Amino acid sequence: MKVIGSLKSAKVRDKDCRIVRRKGRIYVINKKNPRFKARQGY
């Protein structure tokens, strides 16, 4: 999982990317291609 400053670029990498919010953090998840997972930095 990558930790990045802005999820906008991570969101558009693949059409199956979804943004979810868990415990106050914002994540990008992708069920079909899990290597696109990312988390907002702060």
Swiss-Prot record:
GO molecular function: structural constituent of ribosome
UniProt keyword annotations, A-Z: Ribonucleoprotein, Ribosomal protein
Pfam family, one: Ribosomal_L36
Disulfide bond sites: none
InterPro entries the record matches: Ribosomal_bL36 (IPR000473), Ribosomal_bL36_sp (IPR035977), Ribosomal_L36_bact (IPR047621)
GO CC entries: ribonucleoprotein complex; ribosome
Protein name: Large ribosomal subunit protein bL36
